[in-house]
Regions:
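Alpha-helical substrate-binding/gating segment
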Residues: 186-197, 205-241
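Amphipathic terminal alpha-helices
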Residues: 301-320
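N-terminal Rossmann NAD(P)H-binding glycine-rich loop of SDR-like oxidoreductase domains
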Residues: 3-23
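Active-site Tyr-X1-5-Lys
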Residues: 124-166, 181
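Conserved C-terminal active-site "lid" loop/helix of NAD(P)H-dependent oxidoreductases
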Residues: 212, 268-296, 317
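Mid/C-terminal beta-alpha module of Rossmann-like enzyme folds, strongest
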Residues: 218-280
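Substrate-binding strand-loop-helix patch
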Residues: 176-177, 204-214, 232-253, 282, ...
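NAD(P)-dependent short-chain dehydrogenase/reductase
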Residues: 159-207, 250
Length: 320
């Protein structure tokens, strides 16, 4: 199978490339060349800007992709250009989306338009009624103003001439995670035994997470399986822990034996209170991916945490 991967040189993408190349698929990567991708032998390197696909159309056509995997389609304009570039080509799109499309995400961020939806959230759960969730926020992300995965999904799934699959990703963690999702707790665990304080609502809040190699395995599976066309799948590791359980798991791997204390919000120092509503879980149901396509995460939880903790502690500003 010939696979064109757009923006696959980073945190998640490099693992997807390895899996596809190891399975002897013909793989090409479209990227701007701003990072050193260290591509495996045999992977075709196409330099170009995903915002200007027309400029590298000839090179893409020579490669002749059967599947286009887009890990960095963030905006309506990008999705429309993707559809226009590949509509009628005989190819199939696999696009990365996010669990931030669900209505509970609005509630979690304090913009509730409805009571919390029941969890775990299936792929058919209500979506946000607001749009552009990061517009107006000071974020180090070039597409924050126009970011909207709901519009991306609608465009990609709405054209019968271009089969598409959408994968809604969880909070992804692991080595090379630029967001350092484990670091705040690990930093505390490297201290002098002061308890970790969790707001009461936070302690019972659930957020689906996924180890980077497990998420990559899900992407590679969908790329290889044409049965996925026309479907939306939630991705994530099981089970989805409460925040307290998650901290306890990290502590077990990190060797920390300190205390986790649940406190009312008004007893927390004001500068540590997070501007969120913990009643709105971001817990997604990943049953469909497992039952319909036979997905099974390759890396167990404890091993995933061990690798991540080891990497965090090896960083120059690590948490030893």
């Amino acid at each position: 199978m010939r696979v064109l991967a757009i923006g696959a040189t980073g945190f998640i993408g490099r693992h997807v490339l390895r899996l596809l190349a190891d399975d002897r698929h013909d793989v090409a990567v479209l990227h701007r060349g701003e990072t050193a991708p260290n591509l495996q032998e045999g992977i075709c390197d196409i330099r170009g800007n995903r915002d200007q696909l027309a400029e590298c159309r000839e090179e893409i056509q020579r490669f002749g992709p059967e599947v286009i995997l887009d890990l960095i389609v963030y905006t309506e304009r990008q999705a429309r250009e993707l559809v226009n570039a590949f509509r009628g080509s005989g190819g199939r799109i696999v696009a990365v989306s996010s669990a931030d499309v669900y209505r509970n995400y609005d509630g979690f961020r304090g913009n509730a338009t409805a009571p919390p939806d029941p969890t775990p959230l299936s792929e058919n759960a209500p979506l946000r009624q607001t749009r552009y969730p990061y517009r107006g926020h000071d974020l180090p992300f070039a597409y924050a103003h126009d970011y909207e995965k709901i519009l991306v999904e609608e465009l990609l799934l709405g054209d019968p001439r271009l089969p598409a699959t959408v994968l809604r990703l969880p909070a992804v963690y692991g080595p090379e995670d630029k967001q350092h999702r484990l670091q705040p707790y690990l930093q505390h665990m490297s201290g002098d035994g002061i308890p970790i304080f969790l707001e009461k609502g936070q302690a019972s809040w659930r957020w689906t997470r996924g180890f980077v190699e497990n998420v990559a395995a899900a992407l590679a599976l969908v790329v290889k399986d044409p049965r996925s066309a026309g479907h939306v799948y939630n991705v994530g590791d099981e089970p989805t822990f409460t925040e307290r359980e998650w901290v306890e798991r990290i502590a077990g791997v990190a060797g920390w034996e300190g205390e986790i204390v649940e406190v009312p919000r008004d007893e927390l120092p004001e500068d540590t209170r997070q501007p969120v509503d913990w009643r709105y879980d971001l817990w997604t149901d990943t049953t469909a991916l497992r039952t319909e396509l036979g997905y099974a995460p390759p890396v167990p939880l404890d091993e995933a945490l061990r690798r991540t903790v080891r990497w965090e502690r090896s960083e120059p500003d690590g948490t030893d």
